Amino acid sequence: MEKRKNLFMVSLVLSLVIFGLFVLSKRGGNGSLKREFDGLEVSPTYSSYYLQKKDIFETTETSYVDKIFVGDSITDHGEFHEFFPDQVILNRGISKDTSAGVLNRIHEVVGRNAKEVYLLIGVNDIRTKVEQAVYIDNIRKIIDTFANSKSEIYIQSILPVNNSIYGNKVTNDKVILFNTALKQTAKELNVHFLDLFPSFIDQNGQLKKEYTLDGIHLNGKGYKAWTDLVSGTHTTSK
């Protein structure tokens, strides 16, 4: 009797295994099943680098800040504290960031109560074909977040690119259109507009080669030119 019971259990298990294999074969095998499970996973909106940097920013407790630079890789790569050695400087650049990414993390910047905040964002919005209206709406929301802050806000124009080096993923015609909208937005929101663009273009309307290696990011001379313009912001008006 016991032997028959054992045989029945073995037979039942084998039947279930065979049935399972049959179902998998009809649905495309293990790979298909894995793809179905993978399809249920929510794709991350932000890169691991973005999330890591955001977490680090939010963990630090620096106060009495003079200047905060906010932006994408062009900001991220800058050693701004070396250009302003007598001031407390924070770099809040994250490589590949967009206006939406900055909006998602801007509360940490607001909470620092810095004397001055310099925002440079937009080239990745252009590169990833974000509509200008969406971009400007994000900029408005970023600035609105500072409504109760005493920080002086500087919206900086998007820098030109050098298409002969970088290619045509971003055109300067598009940059100019975005910058025109940025300038108007800064005026409407009563914040400073720091127009970097004219100081960085050559006679052909391209990012000066002496300021870049890859056609979009800045080298040492480029950062020196940028920070020199920032140093003169006390003379700019809203």
Regions found by a protein language model. Give the residues of each.
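Alpha/beta-hydrolase-fold catalytic nucleophile elbow
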Residues: 120, 156-157
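A short helix->loop->beta-strand "cap" motif at the edges of active sites that frequently abuts
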Residues: 115, 148-152, 191
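Catalytic His-Asp segment of secreted/periplasmic serine-dependent ester chemistry enzymes
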Residues: 160-238
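Alpha-helical scaffolding segments of alpha/beta enzyme cores, especially the outer helices
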Residues: 137, 141-148, 177-184
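Short, structured coil segments at secondary-structure junctions
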Residues: 85-87, 149, 189
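Conserved SGNH/GDSL esterase-like catalytic core that processes O-acyl groups on lipids
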Residues: 35-141
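Active-site flanking residues adjacent to catalytic metal/cofactor-binding acidic residues
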Residues: 70-72, 156, 194
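N-terminal secretory targeting modules
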Residues: 1-66, 235
